[in-house]
From Swiss-Prot:
Family matches, as InterPro entries: Chromosome_partition/occlusion, HTH_ParB/Spo0J, Nucleoid_occlusion_protein, ParB/RepB/Spo0J, ParB/Sulfiredoxin_dom, ParB/Sulfiredoxin_sf
UniProt-listed GO biological process terms: chromosome segregation; division septum assembly; positive regulation of sporulation resulting in formation of a cellular spore
Annotated protein name in UniProt: Nucleoid occlusion protein
Gene name for this UniProt entry: noc
Keywords annotated in UniProt: Cell cycle, Cell division, Cytoplasm, DNA-binding, Septation
Length: 281
């Protein structure tokens, strides 16, 4: 049976067999709950306390069917690789020990297992999911397309999630708190301007705008921006016109003498630029 993370770790057949043999020899140990620390690479930043309470009731009735997975991190401490919700649940029950399997994984492997395990559960918020994709891309030096293939998802799904990370922190926090939906957030991306995004975000929350209303507001803001007249450039002063004409006449005289001259003229809001190129030969 293939290891669920082998596609990301790129295990060969030999390494795969060795890992499976090792897993068969692994024993479940009961380790102190207080000696366990959360996974540093956990993509989930918020836990639903109601669901943890429900899990605690299930564990009290049926026990822990699947041990948590940890790794040793020195001084008698263990870091969770998989199973943080179970660990939190037994804490609520006041248990002193929890069944666990101890694995020898490095940081990269630990992060990958934690990220993929949570992605497979499909309980992450859109922003947590986006951060998990970004971390996997960084850890394994993958393209969006390669990550999509390994996770069995469409490339557009990965790309759309990653775009959420370009939104202001306030919008990302609203997504994290589930104050707005992913479709609300994706509508805000079109505005580009941070001030407008935040203003509309507040309006979405205060007025409880649905997605269609939000998209209509975005469209109106974009149309208003297109209609806004561009500021007029400063008119040429008399002295400036004289200066520009003098330069042009001088260039004509140089060219008439047989020297190759190229010039470019550009007008900016605050100045007029003339670039002159004279060939050395």
């Amino acid at each position: 049976m293939k290891h669920p993370f082998s596609r990301l770790f790129s295990f060969g057949e030999k390494e795969q067999e060795e890992m499976e043999e090792k897993q068969e020899r692994e024993e479940v140990r009961h380790i102190p709950v207080k000696s366990i620390i959360p996974n540093r690479f956990q993509p989930r930043t918020m836990f639903d306390e109601e669901k943890i309470d429900e899990l605690a009731l299930t564990i009290r009735t049926h026990g822990i069917i699947q041990p948590i997975v940890v790794r040793e991190c020195g001084n008698g401490r263990f870091e969770i690789i998989a199973g943080e919700r179970r660990w939190r649940a037994v804490q609520k029950l006041g248990w002193t020990e929890i069944p666990a399997i101890i694995k020898n994984l490095n940081d990269k492997e630990t992060a990958s297992v934690a990220l993929i395990e949570n992605l497979q559960r499909e309980e992450l918020t859109p922003i947590e999911e986006a951060m998990a994709y970004a971390k996997l891309i960084e850890l394994h030096d993958l393209t969006q397309e390669a990550l999509a293939q390994r996770l069995g998802k469409g490339q557009s799904t990965i790309a759309n999630k990653l775009r959420l990370l370009k939104l202001p922190q306030e919008v990302q926090e609203a997504l994290l708190q589930r104050a707005i939906t992913e479709r609300h957030a994706r509508a805000l991306i079109a505005l580009k301007d941070k001030e407008k995004q935040l203003k509309l975000l507040q309006e979405i929350i205060d007025k409880q705008l649905n997605v269609k209303q939000t998209e209509d507001r975005v469209l109106k803001l974009l149309e208003a921006g297109e209609r806004k007249p561009k500021p007029k450039r400063k008119a040429f002063s008399r002295d400036m016109r004289i200066a520009v004409n003098t330069i042009r006449q001088s260039l004509s005289m140089v060219e008439s003498s047989g020297v190759s001259v190229q010039s470019e003229e550009e007008e900016f809001d605050d100045y007029y630029q003339i670039t002159i190129r004279i060939a050395k030969k």
